């Protein structure tokens, strides 16, 4: 399997890291990769419709279209087929580059328009029954761990730019060898940040050559709760001790997160 495809799979796994959002179904040196993504897209009356998207990336991908299967309990079989056709039409405009995340974002933004088309049955009863599934994503929070930064100044500047461009707030935190990024914002914007982090050359390797980030992990992701502090900006902070870092988490309402996810990094 080509390295760019492996990198795309790695980025997708980091982005779709919620419960049951991502599953690799098969990996083969002869047949390529097959994986499943669970997501939601806005349907009729601002209701969220759960979608199961199965992608098959053949060995010639991204020089050819991926195979796509669409399933949803809240859409008819005919509607699922129309959604698949529209996704493939969009994929034709993205050939020669990694496209899966772009396709997921596209269907999230365009499903309601597709379902309004006459061939999709307009406002069918099957779709309107999803009214009870309405979910307001609101503000989300993600904690990331970086293994190292060799080109620290450039890396920090890049992270600050991404956070600003995507309207994300939070902290880039340094304490000894520990590097953490705490992000707050729209869930799709956080996922877009993750794909940038995974696919752009943000650091240098041991020989000084520019390289992509391969050692990032998502420690935690949740919807922001009432006890969590809302950050007004994205700031870079350095801490001289573990106690000082712990106090930052405690004042943010994340004491449990610190004990469960951060402490194990220093053990």
Swiss-Prot record:
Broad class of the protein's primary localization: nucleus
Pfam family example for this protein?
Answer: RWD
Q: An example Gene Ontology cellular component term from the record?
A: nucleus
* Taxonomy, superkingdom: Eukaryota
NAD found in the keyword field: no
The reply to whether Secreted figures as a keyword in the UniProt entry is: no
Gene3D superfamilies recorded = Ubiquitin Conjugating Enzyme
| SMART domains associated with the record | RWD (SM00591)
UniProtKB keywords: Cytoplasm, Nucleus
Domain RWD: where?
A: 7-114
GO biological process entries: negative regulation of NF-kappaB transcription factor activity; positive regulation of hypoxia-inducible factor-1alpha signaling pathway; positive regulation of protein sumoylation
**Coiled coil regions, renumbered to chain:** none
- Where in the cell is the protein located? Nucleus; Cytoplasm
Subunit details: Interacts with UBE2I/UBC9, NFKBIA, HIF1A and NCOA2.
State its role. Answer: Enhancer of SUMO conjugation. Via its interaction with UBE2I/UBC9, increases SUMO conjugation to proteins by promoting the: binding of E1 and E2 enzymes, thioester linkage between SUMO and UBE2I/UBC9 and transfer of SUMO to specific target proteins which include HIF1A, PIAS, NFKBIA, NR3C1 and TOP1. Positively regulates the NF-kappa-B signaling pathway by enhancing the sumoylation of NF-kappa-B inhibitor alpha (NFKBIA), promoting its stabilization which consequently leads to an increased inhibition of NF-kappa-B transcriptional activity.
- Any domain commentary? The RWD domain is required for the sumoylation enhancement activity.
Protein name from the UniProt record? RWD domain-containing protein 3
